């Protein structure tokens, strides 16, 4: 991969007509493309070979890599190419990615225009770079950052005749993420890196992003299981330290969570579980054991689903979007069990009252002998609309029967859940759009 990238570097510089005199404004540079256009198959007479140039620059001129090349200060131009973002870990709040970092600066002590070079530029490795002055830049907020060594140290150095130095590193970096799960799973997450010179303040080394339209860009499409890449933001800040002011180059990568997986794993099973719990309203007031088993199993299913989702998320002290969904869903199932308890209580009360009524009725039956010898019975009178075989006196007088409660519940529960869905989805989708708009306005500003 590194050979493919390095082979494309001259093409990138030619096609974009990159002018280092614009990138590094601290000194007047000659466009490096003029050197790359130079045909190496037509070498000038008595040209100087690469090894001789390096030997003269580093050994014959008293080059000192510990001294800043320009007393008035250096300007280092930075560009980052993202090769891959491999993972985002929400439990540890970090992300991993492979990147190429390109740094460009002007070192007048490395000017070899007068040496009649055989090539328009010199392509060198990290061994030569170790002998040159460098800005000692690093990611100051990274958890881990290391240059790839597969199979050799992945450092590319290009030296131009006018003293322009371009260094490219292939780095694996683990950076921090500031996770806000309040809108989870309809959320956006930000991960950031801060790049600066570790040893030099801005009076000695000025760090700035490339003038390219996108100083940080992707070499290929980023594919992650849970996230899509939404936006890459770059910013240059000046931060005070006890030793002076430092230039910091901030890059913020914003990810948008893929919602479909959570809908399939959390929301869809919850819908089905709640719909199943409503079946108990149609089983009748006498099927208490079956309705109890159905309600309890529904509650256990939704609790298990909730625990399975929360196991992969960090513990936070605020309420997440999915917490609201699961808690309200469990409340609906719990309320269906409360409705079942009320119906069961009324059925039991009805049964006890029926037995008492039957005893009372049997005691109130009087037998009277008629003139024709026929025995007639006088029974206890019930209120109008009630029968002694099906209703207790309390349910008759109040109008609330188990059947009526089930009938009302079969309408009110779906209606209430429908209203909750409208409020829930409108709020969290609207909130997500507000977050997006704020991020876009920040980029435009």
From Swiss-Prot:
Where is this protein localized, as stated in its record? Cell membrane
Going by the UniProt record, its keywords in alphabetical order are: Cell membrane, Chloride, Chloride channel, Disulfide bond, Glycoprotein, Ion channel, Ion transport, Ligand-gated ion channel, Membrane, Signal, Transmembrane, Transmembrane helix, Transport
Which stretches of this protein does UniProt put in the Extracellular compartment?
27-258, 308-326, 429-445
**Transmembrane in keyword set:** yes
Against Pfam families, the record matches this protein to:
Neur_chan_LBD, Neur_chan_memb
GO biological process annotation, one example: chloride transmembrane transport
Coiled-coil ranges per UniProt: none
Which SUPFAM superfamilies does its entry note?
Neurotransmitter-gated ion-channel transmembrane pore, Nicotinic receptor ligand binding domain-like
What InterPro entries has UniProt attached to this entry? Answer: GABAA/Glycine_rcpt, Neur_chan_lig-bd, Neur_chan_lig-bd_sf, Neur_channel, Neuro-gated_channel_TM_sf, Neuro_actylchol_rec, Neurotrans-gated_channel_TM, Neurotransmitter_ion_chnl_CS
Q: Which cysteines are joined by disulfide bonds?
A: 177-191
Q: In which tissues is it expressed?
A: Expressed in RIA, RIG, PHA and AIZ glutamatergic neurons, URX and RIH cholinergic neurons, and in male-specific MCM neurons.
Q: Which domain of life is it from?
A: Eukaryota
| Alphabetized PANTHER family for the sequence | NEUROTRANSMITTER GATED ION CHANNEL
Summary of subunit composition and partner proteins:
Homopentamer (in vitro). May interact with either acc-3 or acc-4; the interactions do not result in significant heteropentameric ion channel activity.
Its name, as the record gives it, is Acetylcholine-gated chloride channel subunit acc-2
